[in-house]
């Protein structure tokens, strides 16, 4: 018979639960009652087999959003001539993986084909074209989408309506009419208004609340508000500010979702910036966790290799939780800890270190001490209950406490 020393047993007790408790982002999100954790994708990167392998990892991603292939220019490039080829590729991938499809988007001032932006419209003719577009696209994807972003970015920064072709020609009524049309085409899909810079209190968030009330006043269905959440490292709203803002929306009787999360930084990245990014991701996801009617989080692609940020914001990037080489960044563990999961064993940060033991007895005995991010308590837990210097054993749920 082989006898193990007390030190060895203590080490096993610390490390083994770390391994068994480890979980991916979607697994952790669903475990605490969220509907999903997901990511956007786009067709060009679907030729990258290593990328698709991780995209299809349902432990991390339970939902996919097509970044561009369901927008107006992609689906109706010529009037009443519809093409769904690229959108179907993403939809079929999600279906094959058992992932939810969050569909995006139906009415937006951007990425419109020339026949829309340059048309000579009246209220009646543009309404007919808009309703025809919505009806055809939603009908094609009926039963495949968990939710649709029906109207996207209808507001200026001061909360007034954006002067789009739809607002110029139809007025604010185009918004509730779009929602009514989408609901008629697929009565079961969830319908969202989606925008950026509405993640914190201010004129634009107030404008988005006005849109919710407008849609409701027309008797139209609106299920939720999408908070895009394109943030900047070090300037991300606090957890409390985001949670308070979410509460202002849910008080109107709708859900919220974080729909396009990324947190960019000025390049090159540094350890300090990556650490702050981890904190910012944590606070954002924690706000959703704190909010019962925040149904889930979608990141705006998962790897820096295919992020939209560098081509849009000069000198900025590194906005995603995985780097260009598909390695997890500290941000990943920031997200996972906010969701109540244990730290990643493969993160490029030091946060995934397993628990160790430290001898504190002059007689040769040992006391287990969990390192940063290690488990330190929970129902049935028999391992270390003390944390390394500088960290506190923090309650996460009845089954899990963590050194934070």
Curated annotation (Swiss-Prot):
Keywords: Carbohydrate metabolism, Glycoprotein, Glycosidase, Hydrolase, Polysaccharide degradation, Secreted, Signal, Xylan degradation. Residues 368-404 form the CBM1 domain. It comes from the Eukaryota. Pfam families: CBM_1, Glyco_hydro_10. It is found in: Secreted. GO terms for biological process: xylan catabolic process. It is an enzyme of class 3 (hydrolase). The active site is at 153 (proton donor), 260 (nucleophile). Its EC number is 3.2.1.8. InterPro entries: CBD_sf (IPR035971), Cellulose-bd_dom_fun (IPR000254), GH10 (IPR044846), GH10_AS (IPR031158), GH10_dom (IPR001000), Glycoside_hydrolase_SF (IPR017853). Optimum pH is 5.5. Thermotolerant xylanases have many advantages in industrial applications including higher specific activity (lower cost of enzyme), increment of substrate and product solubility, and decrement of microbial contamination. XYN1 provides a potential way for industrial preparations of feruloylated oligosaccharides (FOs) or xylo-oligosaccharides (XOS) from biomass. Synergistic reactions with other polysaccharadide degrading enzymes such as lytic polysaccharide monooxygenases (LPMOs) are important for industrial applications. The keyword Ribosomal protein does not apply. Optimum temperature is 75 degrees Celsius. The keyword Signal applies. Residues 26-338 form the GH10 domain. SMART domains: fCBD, Glyco_10. Pathway: Glycan degradation; xylan degradation. GO terms for cellular component: extracellular region. Glycans are attached at residue 123. Its main location: secreted. It catalyses: Endohydrolysis of (1->4)-beta-D-xylosidic linkages in xylans. The CBM domain in xylanases is involved in the binding ability of enzymes to natural substrates and enzymatic thermostability. Endo-1,4-beta-xylanase involved in the hydrolysis of xylan, a major structural heterogeneous polysaccharide found in plant biomass representing the second most abundant polysaccharide in the biosphere, after cellulose. Efficiently hydrolyzes different xylans including beechwood xylan, birchwood xylan, or oat spelt xylanand; as well as xylo-oligosaccharides (XOS) except xylobiose. The main hydrolytic product is xylobiose, followed by xylotriose and unidentified longer XOS. A small amount of xylose appears with extended hydrolysis time. PANTHER family: ENDO-1,4-BETA-XYLANASE, GLYCOSYL HYDROLASE. This is Endo-1,4-beta-xylanase 1. It comes from Penicillium parvum. The gene is XYN1.
